[in-house]
Swiss-Prot record:
CDD domains assigned: MIT_VPS4 (cd02678), RecA-like_VPS4 (cd19521)
Protein name per Swiss-Prot or TrEMBL: Vacuolar protein sorting-associated protein 4B
Entries under InterPro entries matching the protein: AAA+_ATPase, AAA_lid_3, ATPase_AAA_core, ATPase_AAA_CS, MIT_dom, MIT_dom_sf, MT-severing_AAA_ATPase, P-loop_NTPase
Membrane topology reported for the UniProt record: Peripheral membrane protein
Keywords: ATP-binding, Cell cycle, Cell division, Coiled coil, Endosome, Hydrolase, Membrane, Nucleotide-binding, Phosphoprotein, Protein transport, Transport
Source species: Bos taurus (Bovine)
Pfam families according to UniProt: AAA, AAA_lid_3, MIT, Vps4_C
Comment field on protein domains: The MIT domain serves as an adapter for ESCRT-III proteins. It forms an asymmetric three-helix bundle that binds amphipathic MIM (MIT interacting motif) helices along the groove between MIT helices 2 and 3 present in a subset of ESCRT-III proteins thus establishing the canonical MIM-MIT interaction. In an extended conformation along the groove between helices 1 and 3, also binds to a type-2 MIT interacting motif (MIM2).
Region (Disordered): 77-117
Function: Involved in late steps of the endosomal multivesicular bodies (MVB) pathway. Recognizes membrane-associated ESCRT-III assemblies and catalyzes their disassembly, possibly in combination with membrane fission. Redistributes the ESCRT-III components to the cytoplasm for further rounds of MVB sorting. MVBs contain intraluminal vesicles (ILVs) that are generated by invagination and scission from the limiting membrane of the endosome and mostly are delivered to lysosomes enabling degradation of membrane proteins, such as stimulated growth factor receptors, lysosomal enzymes and lipids. (Microbial infection) In conjunction with the ESCRT machinery also appears to function in topologically equivalent membrane fission events, such as the terminal stages of cytokinesis and enveloped virus budding (lentiviruses).
Annotated localization: Late endosome membrane
GO cellular component terms attached to this protein's record: centrosome; cytosol; Flemming body; late endosome membrane; nucleus; spindle pole
Length: 444
């Protein structure tokens, strides 16, 4: 092949001719010219272009020409089946190509868009999680901000007119296990008139070049079509970390598309809330951080919230704990997250089962029948110490299935589980989160 300027010039000439043929309506000729131009451009990128900026610029042009070539290819395929007026470059598509079919179904003619949107349909939460605001212990500041952004605009739309607009982006950040995703579940439950999209990086990252940013674009299009909508992105740092020279082209393009869709020129995001959650907010790109107008710190729970969590996690399970016991547990678990407390309670709930497994003696007691809880029987068996009056030497294997009465959960079970469960959050991470809150956030 000839020298660099000739190859690049040839690619530019071919692209220019393709655009002319496209405008003139010679679509078959234009398609071939676009394809040849892209081949030359890719050759220049691979073997000849110097510098990242030049390569990036050429790749962007290639994507543009390939998109147009795909549209022409689709149109030419359809034209073989039925003649119809083509879409000229730079002109809007006719009504039936935008999805307003004459048959009234409103289906999009673009198969690629349909495929991407079908891929994202799985992110829509159809069945509402049953988590109410009252199930979330503490975090009053975060709950109020979410009600202000989600519930009030739906219930009282007249409040949010003119310059008073609801928040479009809220970032929840804090140590792991403090209830960020749980709060999002509460939002999904309470905002029952909204479409809730729960997104992770695997929903948006594709191995195919250019498909990831199309998925991001289609996610926001789908949210606009189904508004009011909430887009919840868990672990957003995996998608929108700081831009650097070492990151891949694909990662940079995903970030750019997020920036454009969240707050770009000509983008209408009325009725759409983007809710992000992260444990490491300091790695977020500064432009992404700015688009989250409210940045709320979800801290480790305080003593009264921890006491309430012990109660919530015990639920209706029979136990002998008093209010004083719950307060005591709240004081003893300084530095524990909500997830840590959940693990302590789950382990404590297993203690009666372990007592049954290790028991060598059982005794007969009165209690509700397994078949009919309203009927009190006196032949149930419960574990006891060998010196207990009425103790019968036997193991749990000898106890009939419907005759076992397990011990209730008591304070000693809780303390035993607490002694074997350590907190998962370290002091170093907490200091970094507090520093980020001082610089950019607000307390939840």
């Amino acid at each position: 092949m000839a020298s660099t300027p000739t190859n690049l010039q040839k690619a530019i000439d071919l692209a220019s001719k393709a655009a002319q043929e496209d405008k003139a309506g010679n679509y078959e000729e234009a398609l071939q010219l676009y394809q040849h131009a892209v081949q030359y451009f890719l050759h220049v990128v691979k073997y000849e272009a110097q510098g990242d900026k030049a390569k990036q610029s050429i790749r962007a042009k290639c994507t543009e020409y390939l998109d147009r070539a795909e549209k022409l290819k689709e149109y030419l395929k359809k034209r073989e089946k039925k003649p119809q007026k083509p879409v000229k470059e730079g002109q809007p598509a006719p009504a039936d190509e935008k999805g307003n079919d004459s048959d009234g179904e409103g289906e999009s003619d673009d198969p690629e868009k349909k495929k991407l949107q079908n891929q994202l349909q799985g992110a829509i939460v159809i069945e509402r999680p049953n988590v109410k605001w009252s199930d979330v212990a503490g975090l009053e500041g975060a709950k109020e901000a979410l009600k202000e952004a989600v519930i009030l605009p739906i219930k009282f739309p007249h409040l949010f007119t003119g310059k008073r607009t609801p928040w479009r982006g809220i970032l929840l950040f804090g140590p792991p296990g403090t209830g960020k995703s749980y709060l999002a579940k509460a939002v999904a439950t309470e905002a029952n008139n909204s479409t809730f999209f729960s997104i992770s990086s695997s929903d948006l990252v594709s191995k195919w070049l250019g498909e990831s940013e199309k998925l991001v674009k289609n996610l926001f299009q789908l949210a606009r079509e189904n508004k009011p909508s909430i887009i919840f992105i868990d672990e957003i740092d995996s998608l929108c970390g700081s831009r650097s020279e070492n990151e891949s082209e694909a990662a940079r393009r995903i970030k750019t598309e997020f920036l454009v869709q969240m707050q770009g020129v000509g983008v209408d995001n009325d009725g759409i809330l983007v809710l992000g959650a992260t444990n490491i907010p300091w790695v977020l790109d500064s432009a992404i951080r700015r688009r989250f107008e409210k940045r709320i710190y979800i801290p480790l729970p305080e003593a009264h919230a921890r006491a309430a969590m012990f109660k919530l996690h015990l639920g209706t399970t029979q136990n002998s704990l008093t209010e004083a016991d719950f307060r005591d547990l709240g004081k003893k678990t300084e530095g524990y997250s909500g997830a840590d407390i959940s693990i302590i309670v789950r382990d404590a709930l297993m203690q009666p089962v372990r007592k049954v497994q290790s028991a060598t003696h059982f005794k007969k007691v009165r209690g509700p029948s397994r078949a009919d809880p309203n009927n009190i029987v006196d032949d149930l068996l419960t574990p006891c110490s060998p010196g207990d009056p009425g103790a019968i030497e036997m193991t749990w294997m000898d106890v009939p299935g419907d005759k076992l009465l397990e011990p209730v959960v008591c304070m000693s079970d809780m303390l035993r589980s607490l002694s074997s469960t350590k907190p998962t959050v370290n002091e170093h991470d907490l200091l970094k989160l507090k520093k980020f809150t001082e610089d950019f956030g607000q307390e939840g």
